[in-house]
A protein has these predicted regions:
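N-terminal helix initiation/capping motif
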Residues: 1-32
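Short coil-to-beta-strand transition motifs
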Residues: 19-22, 59-67
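Short, conserved beta-turn/loop elements at beta-strand boundaries and strand-helix junctions
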Residues: 32, 73-78
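Short beta-strand-centered aromatic/proline hotspots
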Residues: 25-27, 64-73
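Short, solvent-exposed secondary-structure boundary/capping segments
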Residues: 76-87
């Protein structure tokens, strides 16, 4: 059984540093409306989540601060993959 295409924005596959409240991670891919990243911890679909993604720009590092919800998780070894929607975001200097 296949899932219907649910993404509204094109994903960019790029490893970027993700900062969470009590953990760090790295993105597998991201888009304006969501991100998938590997981290440690326990997450539940539907759970609210806040995270920041570090971006390196021509004018220096920026933090893309995001709020959203966990869509799904994918356990792997000692890590967990987290797919999250982004419902609010701001861009700030690091």
């Amino acid at each position: 059984m296949t899932r219907p295409h649910q993404r509204k924005d094109k994903r960019v596959e790029v490893p970027l540093l993700v900062l969470l409240e009590n953990a760090r991670g790295v993105t597998r891919d991201t888009s304006p409306s969501g991100a998938f990243f590997w981290t440690s911890g326990t997450y539940t679909p539907g759970q609210p989540i806040s995270f920041a993604i570090e971006l390196k720009t021509a004018i220096g590092k920026m933090m893309w601060k995001c709020k959203g919800a966990v869509v799904r998780t994918e356990p792997r070894d000692h890590m967990v993959g987290v797919a999250a929607t982004i419902t609010e975001s701001t861009m700030e200097p690091a």
